[in-house]
């Protein structure tokens, strides 16, 4: 069925699913180093999470987010995600989508967002 907006609700975005009339074109994506503090010492799951986040859809492909591996605290890895600045908005929504992709890419690792 069709979703009905309740009073006080508003549509934040639309997601189009299907095939276009023409083939889409690829676009450049940022590197892990451009959007994170990953080094040779950073856990591989963190890098995989960032790589997955870089594949997440963002408003006009801006990728205005960053991830920081903070370290360990109380036996848990800590990761910080930040939204960047954008003239067109949507960075908070983009950050949520990127964080989800990070979680999928990182796998079953015991970490927490800080």
Residue ranges: model-predicted function:
Residues 1-114:
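Acidic, surface-exposed loops and disordered segments
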């Amino acid at each position: 069925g069709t979703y009905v907006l309740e009073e006080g609700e508003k549509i934040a975005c639309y997601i189009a699913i299907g095939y276009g009339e023409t083939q889409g074109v690829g676009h450049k994506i940022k590197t892990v180093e451009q959007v994170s503090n990953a080094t040779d010492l950073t856990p591989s799951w963190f890098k995989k999470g960032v790589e997955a986040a870089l594949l997440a859809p963002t408003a006009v492909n801006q990728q205005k987010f960053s991830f920081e591996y903070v370290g360990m605290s109380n036996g848990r890895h800590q990761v910080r995600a930040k939204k960047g600045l954008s003239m067109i908005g949507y960075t908070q929504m983009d950050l949520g989508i990127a964080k989800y992709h990070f979680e999928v890419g990182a796998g079953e690792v015991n970490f927490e967002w800080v």
